[in-house]
């Protein structure tokens, strides 16, 4: 690394990582798994476009810090998904990267050992190995697209991705979303602004050229054709924004922008007033709107773990409680199971009219 009076003044170290090609060669997808992921992406695309009447439910831990916990959660989630599949399409949250308002643990890829060692190469390997195990269970997977380089390493394993509230306004992330191979949800801004998400969705649907890395790890000029499978995610802001009036306002603004109204409601964050225990109430309110004839709401997002609440990510790993989030607080598996079964029962036989 060149370091002198003008170059890398604030850089203290440089490590060359394995390339996306090398990671995929070490942890390859089978042809059957490729077909499975392509099929789940199509199912989600059909739901967003109104061709499939089911409700998309992106549900799971706020973040993944322990692969064993993730696998146990996935086994329960898979069994439930099979039981409710006629009206709900369940996709498991597998979030490895966490945007921070200031500082804090940035996720399993960035610091997999949670000790400040920042062993990113190990993080990428742990993440891809876990994703392959989850795909092998037959689960469609969701993530937040945060680092623009990560999709080259892991993007082939995901069926849906989100652009978060802190990055929806970023040109870098809009360009990245235009090239992602799966449907993408855009969250409204942290201030509640709908225009931020709607403009991002419009931008990502267009072709772009930008600098990124290719599968060989080389810096390359990438050209995209645009991503047609975008939708808005209402996550609240200074106040919740999932009421019928809020949903109608989002529909209006999307139509004015020339977009088909297609939106998901995040039951956590601003919509729960940051109280994880309110997520079921938010979900039930949204389901009531669907039962009343709403066709623009295509999905729900729920933060859920094996056990409820959260814990500090700064304590020693040996002292961490099993199955408890180290980022946002989550509802328990028992509450998740009961909620999704209730939604399934409420929507039973009521969704066929939603097909466009």
UniProtKB/Swiss-Prot annotation:
It holds the Pfam family DAHP_synth_1. Its cofactor is a divalent metal cation. Its EC number is 2.5.1.54. GO terms for molecular function: 3-deoxy-7-phosphoheptulonate synthase activity; identical protein binding. The keyword Amino-acid biosynthesis applies. The keyword Signal does not apply. Transmembrane segments: none annotated. It catalyses: D-erythrose 4-phosphate + phosphoenolpyruvate + H2O = 7-phospho-2-dehydro-3-deoxy-D-arabino-heptonate + phosphate. One of its GO terms (cellular component) is cytoplasm. Keywords: Amino-acid biosynthesis, Aromatic amino acid biosynthesis, Transferase. Pathway: Metabolic intermediate biosynthesis; chorismate biosynthesis; chorismate from D-erythrose 4-phosphate and phosphoenolpyruvate: step 1/7. There are 3 DAHP synthases, AroF is feedback-inhibited by Tyr. The other 2 DAHP synthases are Phe- and Trp-sensitive, respectively. Belongs to the class-I DAHP synthase family. Stereospecific condensation of phosphoenolpyruvate (PEP) and D-erythrose-4-phosphate (E4P) giving rise to 3-deoxy-D-arabino-heptulosonate-7-phosphate (DAHP). This is Phospho-2-dehydro-3-deoxyheptonate aldolase, Tyr-sensitive. The gene is aroF.
